[in-house]
């Protein structure tokens, strides 16, 4: 320790680092330092009976410019002087190396200890500066400023938040199907999950089982299980019509509905042929190819079905187009010309084996389009069973049969071009008689009789 520091602290030379001297009479002098130094002398004598007595009156206090201070504070003042000297020495070295490097493991552990800030304050006179946590509000603002889905597909309108999702999506446009083929049918898929779901259709595996007691149902897809679990959630009566989620109160449901604003989960793309709905237009276009291939294979309705299944006009195409206002009225068919054409085609087929009988009669093609497309693009607003929910106003097969077959005494719904349903009751006797005399009088046409005649003839 620097000698000048001690001299300034005690204002007297110190020999051999001794902080006090002992007199011959037994009195001990203690030295201390403070703002104004003082020297206190305390005398103690020992009585003859062995007890200690302190002569407070004979105690002499030597003070500086200030008053007296108790003697037990002197050691504290000495420690403060030593600490001040350490701070001054460390401050001089802090300009070159404020935070030293540790070469030993125990020092490094102490460096990483929670007492590190206090130790550094005692050594360098200041607390270390650590990085502060970022402001949550500023961080959220930066996240909102960033585009949610910056990776956009160049072939369609879809966008993704991750580049890997975009690369998976591009396989659909490029026709890349790396997963497969299926061991049962040889199909390939763009994603592994699609292949796994497809294999379950062959094996019948249903790994997703309902966990509610008393319900043994199982499903091959997780989405089907989630939709099924809604029927067990009696404590959540508020159900979302766009997905499988349920809620306990109405406000939670109202807060959830805006998440479907992009129509991501809504099946708004409806097939005009069969009434099936899909969430994306590409799925609908892929489904429409089945109807186009079916029409080409049967050679029926080629004058009605568009040649290109991806034609945008296909989505707005009415399968009853070109049939007039009475498209669903069975009396609009000319039964005489239809039976004559059928007989002529049968004769041609019997004379030439290489001839493929394709009935090109317009009325006959329209008839088969009606049978193959039981669901209309313009659904009736009401039926005899009451109102249906939006999106499910489809004509059932039973209603379709009752429309053209008057054998039942129940009401038959006839749908006009405007989409309104007209219910008319037709007795069974009248319908049967009119069907029997249809060839001569052009009455009510029964398509079932024509189908039976076709089955009885061989081409």
UniProtKB/Swiss-Prot annotation:
Residues 390-406 are annotated as: Interacts with mab-10. InterPro entries: Znf_C2H2_sf, Znf_C2H2_type. Residues 1-73, 423-459 are annotated as: Disordered. It is found in: Nucleus. One of its GO terms (biological process) is exit from mitosis. Residues 1-14, 57-73, 446-459 have a biased composition (Polar residues). Residues 16-56, 423-444 have a biased composition (Low complexity). Interacts (via C-terminus) with transcription cofactor mab-10. This is Zinc finger transcription factor lin-29. It comes from Caenorhabditis elegans. The gene is lin-29.
């Amino acid at each position: 320790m620097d000698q000048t520091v001690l001299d300034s602290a005690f204002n007297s030379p110190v020999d051999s680092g001794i902080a006090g001297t002992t007199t011959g009479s037994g009195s001990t002098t203690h030295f201390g330092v403070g703002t104004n130094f003082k020297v206190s002398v305390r005398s103690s004598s020992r009585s003859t009976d062995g007890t200690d007595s302190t002569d407070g009156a004979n105690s002499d206090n030597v003070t500086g410019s200030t008053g007296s201070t108790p003697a037990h504070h002197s050691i504290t003042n000495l420690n403060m002087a030593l600490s001040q000297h350490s701070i001054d020495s460390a401050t001089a070295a802090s300009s070159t190396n404020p935070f030293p490097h540790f070469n030993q493991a125990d020092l490094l552990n102490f460096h990483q200890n929670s007492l590190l800030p206090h130790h550094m304050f005692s050594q360098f006179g200041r607390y270390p500066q650590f990085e502060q946590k970022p402001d949550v509000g500023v961080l959220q603002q930066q996240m909102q400023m960033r585009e949610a889905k910056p990776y956009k597909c160049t072939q369609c309108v879809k966008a993704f938040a991750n580049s890997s999702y975009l690369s998976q999506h591009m396989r659909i446009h490029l026709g890349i199907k790396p997963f497969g083929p299926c061991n049962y049918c040889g199909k390939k898929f763009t994603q592994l999950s699609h292949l796994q779901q497809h294999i379950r259709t062959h094996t019948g595996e249903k790994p997703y089982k309902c966990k509610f007691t008393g319900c043994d149902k199982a499903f091959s897809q997780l989405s089907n299980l989630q939709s099924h679990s809604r029927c067990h959630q009696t404590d959540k009566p508020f159900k979302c019509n766009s997905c499988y989620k349920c809620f306990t109160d109405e406000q939670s449901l109202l807060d959830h509905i805006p998440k479907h604003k992009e129509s991501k989960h809504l099946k708004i793309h409806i097939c005009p042929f069969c009434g099936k709905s899909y969430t994306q237009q590409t799925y609908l276009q892929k489904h429409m190819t089945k109807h186009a291939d079916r029409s080409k294979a049967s050679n029926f309705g080629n004058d009605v079905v568009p040649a290109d299944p991806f034609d945008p006009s296909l989505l707005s195409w009415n399968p009853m187009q070109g049939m007039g206002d009475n498209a669903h009225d069975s009396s609009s068919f000319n039964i005489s010309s239809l039976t004559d054409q059928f007989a002529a085609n049968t004769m041609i087929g019997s004379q030439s084996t290489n001839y493929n009988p394709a009935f090109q009669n317009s009325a006959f093609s329209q008839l088969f389009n009606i049978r193959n497309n039981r669901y209309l693009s313009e659904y009736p607003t009401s039926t005899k069973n009451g109102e249906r929910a939006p999106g499910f106003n489809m004509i059932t097969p039973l209603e379709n049969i009752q429309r053209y077959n008057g054998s039942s005494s129940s009401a038959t719904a006839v749908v006009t071009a405007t989409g309104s349903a007209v219910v008319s009751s037709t007795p069974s006797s009248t319908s049967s008689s009119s069907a029997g005399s249809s060839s001569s009088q052009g009455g009510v046409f029964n398509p079932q009789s024509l189908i039976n005649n076709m089955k009885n003839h061989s081409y």
